[in-house]
């Protein structure tokens, strides 16, 4: 099976008007060579308008180019997935659509990746899961945030599920790089 999609988009994000009258093009393709296996590539090229350039004091549009490649195997309660993402284009001083000042200090490249797996320990009842992920907001190791997770999912019924996870985080942007998280979550489906 082969799937593709492409779109031409206007605007600066959800409920945001267009600031530079330019369009973004977003598309993707994926193939499914065997049942349960999907391999894909996705891309986005466009601009973000009305950005204040701190070096000139004027507003301008900045280019943004992003792509991702991914692979997934999902069959008989076994799931394995990996993805790499890359972004090129200047970011804003802080997150959100209301901040319109270019941040040259962070550079114009970022990337990240993750791999994870879920396997059944007791079919239909108990699954073990593990995940490793990295995000580098300057596409270098001195700004990386790395996270290792492991956990269990227990299904009381098809509509009631308990998740338990332990995570170790190494955030090189912080003075104290390493910290740990424990997360418990109860999901109701209706």
Give the label of every model feature segment.
Residues 1-38, 42:
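Aromatic- and glycine-enriched pocket-lining scaffold segments that form the walls
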Residues 1-4, 36-39, 77-82, 124-128, ...:
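Repeated loop/turn-to-beta-strand initiation elements of outer-membrane beta-barrel proteins
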Residues 4-10, 41-45, 82-86, 130-134, ...:
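Transmembrane beta-barrel strands of outer-membrane/channel proteins
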Residues 28-30, 68-72, 116-118, 151, ...:
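Outer-membrane beta-barrel architecture
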Residues 31-35, 74-77, 121-123, 154-160, ...:
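Outer-membrane beta-barrel strand-turn architecture
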Residues 60-98:
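Oxyanion-binding "anion nests"
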Residues 178-190:
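Outer-membrane beta-barrel "beta-signal"
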